Regions:
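Active-site loop immediately N-terminal to the catalytic Tyr-X3-Lys motif
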Residues: 29, 75-81, 137
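Short, small/polar-rich loop/turn modules that mediate ligand/substrate recognition or access, typified
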Residues: 102-106, 160-161
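Alpha-helical segment proximal to the catalytic Tyr-Lys
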Residues: 56, 98-103
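Short, small-residue-biased leader/transition segments that mark boundaries at the very start
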Residues: 1-8
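C-terminal substrate-recognition "lid" of short-chain dehydrogenase/reductases
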Residues: 57, 138-166, 171
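Substrate-binding pocket helix/loop in short-chain dehydrogenase/reductase
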Residues: 27-28, 35-40, 130
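Active-site helix of classical SDR
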Residues: 51, 86, 94
Length: 174
């Protein structure tokens, strides 16, 4: 029911950014089915069905979809046996939708790296270890992700099916 409210407010839909996500560790030994559903539903299922709900509106406006993926869609994060595969699924969904929805709708993704730390926090030593693995030697800002999304939406009319890493160069040195 989100889309009817959105289109009622503005009467058209040009852009869908799938940014909602759940992130937490799921070690295999203690993984529950509820955790599986929580992570898959928020990181893969919800974006798919939001795209489906927005389809006719985005076709009418030659709109664009941007999915917020994660650099860990390509390289697993220890003890996150569900999150990584969910984001990898979102990366493949991004490419599949680009193939299926063109030429009317462009579909791309942005894969953030160290931008915001988990709500529960992580030890300072771990933060610094992650930052040392980036070429730019610093964490990013939410504005860095927003600028990449804005580029894909506004300045990239010939780009579809791509996922831009916004990770300070971390994925270069995996």
């Amino acid at each position: 029911p989100l889309l009817p409210y959105t289109t009622l407010f503005r009467s058209r839909l040009d852009i869908l950014v799938n940014n909602a996500s759940v992130f937490y560790a799921t070690p295999l030994a203690s993984l529950t089915e509820a955790q599986w559903h929580d992570l898959i539903d928020s990181n893969l299922k919800a974006p798919l069905f939001l795209c489906q709900s927005a389809l006719s509106h985005l076709r009418a406006t030659q709109g664009t979809i941007v999915n917020i993926v994660d650099i860990h869609a390509q390289r697993p994060l220890r003890e996150h046996v569900v999150y990584g595969p969910a984001k990898a699924g979102l990366a493949m969904l991004t490419r599949s939708l680009a193939k299926d929805l063109g030429p009317e709708i462009r579909v791309n993704g942005v894969a953030p790296g160290a931008i915001l730390w988990p709500d529960a926090g992580i030890p300072e030593k771990l933060e610094q270890a992650i930052i040392r693995k980036t070429s730019l030697q610093r964490a990013g800002e939410p504005a860095d992700v927003a600028k990449a999304v804005l580029f894909l939406v506004r300045d990239a009319p010939y780009v579809t099916g791509q996922i831009i890493a916004v990770d300070g160069g971390r994925s270069v040195g995996w």
